[in-house]
Amino acid sequence: MGGRKWQSIKRQKARVDAQKGKTTTQLSRAIIVAARQGIPDPAGNFQLRTAIEKARAAGVPNDSIDRAIAKGAGTYEDGESNYEEMRYEGYGPGGVAVLIEALTDNRNRTAADLRAAFSKKGGNLGETGCVSWMFSQKGVIRLVGELEEEKLLEALLEGEGESYEWLDEEDGGGVEVFSAVNQLENLNQVLQNHGFTIAETELRWLPENTIEIAEPDQAKALMQMIDTLESLDDVQSVTSNFELTEELLALAG
């Protein structure tokens, strides 16, 4: 399944996660929205359960998690719970496509912050639909621990998984399995039933094709722009369609 295409995404993601990781604010907002959109009980709300697992893995205190669930359920009102999911699109230096998912309680503030982050590095925030056609959304589950390929294939067949890819240790190790968005919860349950250890479950935008970046200055500007975008509390995820060599990735850092 197009190894280099996926490797590029994982390298960029690993770098950003290692540098910053998601803040408590970002993770709590994801819990609030998940609890509001479904029932505020993780046992019956897959999106909420996944958001809570991510928060716990990042060390978010239990009281913060409980408070976020209560905010989403409407039992803890503080005037800060009215978040909506937004998707923004734009272009980085050299015309690279950038897709951003955000949770915001103020669209104007978020758009202004994003516009500033883009323009500072020679990019620009675009109109809705300008680059989203270049990406597809997939369910992604990362498995760790003992992994037998034959058993994995059986589970993927049963759970309607689409593909899988082994990860290098520098990318966290294990294997990532991919599914259609509407099959993610089912595949997650099937993998659990087969005894696999699940490290992470998420929806992820993946580029259909990538742009090779060969200029060090452009690579540095792109990585700095993505770092700035990721650092905004309103931002939940940033996906792009550029690809760097390992040498350029090191220079960009």
Swiss-Prot record:
Keywords assigned: Cytoplasm, DNA-binding, Transcription, Transcription regulation
Localisation: Cytoplasm
GO CC terms of this entry: cytosol
Keyword Protein biosynthesis applies: no
Region Disordered: start-end pairs: 1-22
A Gene Ontology biological process term: regulation of DNA-templated transcription
PANTHER family linked: TRANSCRIPTIONAL REGULATORY PROTEIN YEBC-RELATED (PTHR12532:SF6), TRANSLATIONAL ACTIVATOR OF CYTOCHROME C OXIDASE 1 (PTHR12532)
Gene3D superfamilies: 1.10.10.200, 3.30.70.980
Membership in a protein family: Belongs to the TACO1 family.
Name of the protein: Probable transcriptional regulatory protein slr0989
Entry's Gene Ontology molecular function annotations: DNA binding
Organism: Synechocystis sp. (strain ATCC 27184 / PCC 6803 / Kazusa)
